Amino acid sequence: MSEGKKPGSGRKSSGRGQRDLRVRVKSAKGRKLSSTLWLERQLNDPYVARAKREGYRGRAAYKILELDDKYRFLVPGARVVDLGCAPGGWCQVAVARVNALGDKSGKKVGRVLGVDLQEVDPIPGAEIHQLDFLSEGADEQVKAWLGGRADVVMSDMAAASSGHKGTDHLRIVALVEAAAQLAFDVLEPGGTFVAKVLAGGAENEMQAMLKRNFRKVANVKPPASRSDSSEKFVVAQGFRGRGDAEDVENGEDDGA
């Protein structure tokens, strides 16, 4: 999208109108500057436009697509649990990749289970439940819905922003640790755990915990993750199982 006079309108231009094809959002009375900047960024984000074209519920879908392109954990036949699944973009990707709809002839058919505190609009091929994953018995409920253990537990959750980076970092690390604890209870040996975390220095204990429980732990910032964001994703593969992990001091780290 462009703004102002179009190039080639018949008059010479100073070039100032052509230096930037980004959409500019005028500040409206009553709208905070932060809201204006967020809206401008959304309107100019190629991933936002692509998500609309391709039918995904948000740009975050491309983060899990890019992670799976690299680490190949969403395979046909896999059983996937998406924690904090709203608005549903990660579930949409998982449905397609694990063949949950069974539309890939000759491929195994997977399962996708999404849980969230809030109601989520139905997603073809996914089973969505309203659940607080921190509640007592949530792990057993998830296994009951799946009819067994999961191959993948993934989370794009983030705690509500406090406006203070240090506080937000601590909150999301605690959230990832809680999600990992549920993953330990529901994953099959060899399974994968994927979660978003904000960089900030307090994640060392969480990383050590994952290394004790998984054979490989990687820290990744996919291309779809905004460059000015402190978010990254931890991809932990090769779950050892509850018994094996207790005797392991360190796992293998594939990069920060």
UniProtKB/Swiss-Prot annotation:
It catalyses: uridine(2552) in 23S rRNA + S-adenosyl-L-methionine = 2'-O-methyluridine(2552) in 23S rRNA + S-adenosyl-L-homocysteine + H(+). Signal peptide: none annotated. Residues 246-256 have a biased composition (Acidic residues). GO terms for molecular function: rRNA (uridine-2'-O-)-methyltransferase activity. It is found in: Cytoplasm. Keywords: Cytoplasm, Methyltransferase, rRNA processing, S-adenosyl-L-methionine, Transferase. One of its GO terms (cellular component) is cytoplasm. The keyword Transit peptide does not apply. The active site is at residue 196. The keyword Cell membrane does not apply. InterPro entries: RNA_methyltr_RlmE, RNA_MeTrfase_FtsJ_dom, rRNA-MeTfrase_E, SAM-dependent_MTases_sf. Its EC number is 2.1.1.166. Its main location: cytoplasm. Specifically methylates the uridine in position 2552 of 23S rRNA at the 2'-O position of the ribose in the fully assembled 50S ribosomal subunit. Belongs to the class I-like SAM-binding methyltransferase superfamily. RNA methyltransferase RlmE family. This is Ribosomal RNA large subunit methyltransferase E. It comes from Paracoccus denitrificans (strain Pd 1222). The gene is rlmE.
